[in-house]
Curated annotation (Swiss-Prot):
<feature type="binding site">
    <location>
        <position position="47"/>
    </location>
    <ligand>
        <name>Zn(2+)</name>
    </ligand>
</feature>
<protein>
    <recommendedName>
        <fullName>Peptide methionine sulfoxide reductase MsrB</fullName>
        <ecNumber>1.8.4.12</ecNumber>
    </recommendedName>
</protein>
<feature type="binding site">
    <location>
        <position position="96"/>
    </location>
    <ligand>
        <name>Zn(2+)</name>
    </ligand>
</feature>
<dbReference type="Pfam" id="PF01641">
    <property type="entry name" value="SelR"/>
</dbReference>
<keyword id="KW-0479">Metal-binding</keyword>
<dbReference type="InterPro" id="IPR011057">
    <property type="entry name" value="Mss4-like_sf"/>
</dbReference>
<dbReference type="GO" id="GO:0006979">
    <property type="term" value="P:response to oxidative stress"/>
</dbReference>
<dbReference type="GO" id="GO:0005737">
    <property type="term" value="C:cytoplasm"/>
</dbReference>
<comment type="similarity">
    <text>Belongs to the MsrB Met sulfoxide reductase family.</text>
</comment>
<dbReference type="GO" id="GO:0030091">
    <property type="term" value="P:protein repair"/>
</dbReference>
<dbReference type="GO" id="GO:0033743">
    <property type="term" value="F:peptide-methionine (R)-S-oxide reductase activity"/>
</dbReference>
<dbReference type="InterPro" id="IPR028427">
    <property type="entry name" value="Met_Sox_Rdtase_MsrB"/>
</dbReference>
<dbReference type="GO" id="GO:0008270">
    <property type="term" value="F:zinc ion binding"/>
</dbReference>
<keyword id="KW-0862">Zinc</keyword>
<feature type="binding site">
    <location>
        <position position="99"/>
    </location>
    <ligand>
        <name>Zn(2+)</name>
    </ligand>
</feature>
<feature type="binding site">
    <location>
        <position position="50"/>
    </location>
    <ligand>
        <name>Zn(2+)</name>
    </ligand>
</feature>
<feature type="active site" description="Nucleophile">
    <location>
        <position position="119"/>
    </location>
</feature>
Length: 131
């Protein structure tokens, strides 16, 4: 997969302020505030920055954590996992494999079949109908 590389100024001009803060500066939207937290429509969730397909809506579940949660990415190659020791915690950050956008974190407390919970910021994703 060909990487997309832009300067922070280029990303800032493409994204709204909240998208920029979360995707490019590794921020976090407030829990229960994101437009996809309670979303139930079918489709594919794509990276808001580069359009890469990230999650199938059929893998979304209600974790009660305040952010959209998925038990698996659409392809393992769509994500990069990075050890995150910020805020006095040890977590695993997930970023878009194509543009390095911060998406959220993955935790080992999800449902079968993976046992994983990809906790994703709504501002980082875009739900599109299936082709």
């Amino acid at each position: 997969m060909k990487k997309i590389e832009k300067t922070l100024d280029e990303w800032r001009s493409m994204l709204d302020p909240e998208q920029y803060q979360v995707c490019r500066l590794k921020g976090t939207e407030r829990p229960f505030s994101g437009k996809y937290n309670s979303e139930r429509r079918d489709g594919i969730y794509h990276c808001i920055c580069c359009g890469l397909a990230l999650f199938d809506a059929q893998t979304k579940f209600d974790a009660g954590c305040g952010w959209p949660s998925f038990y698996a990415p659409i392809e393992d190659s769509a994500m990069i996992e990075i050890r995150d020791t910020s805020h006095g915690m040890i977590r695993t950050e997930v970023t878009c494999a194509r543009c390095d956008a911060h998406l959220g974190h993955v935790f080992p407390d999800g449902p079968p079949p993976t046992g994983l919970r990809y906790c994703i910021n709504s501002v980082c994703i875009d739900l599109r109908p299936r082709d």
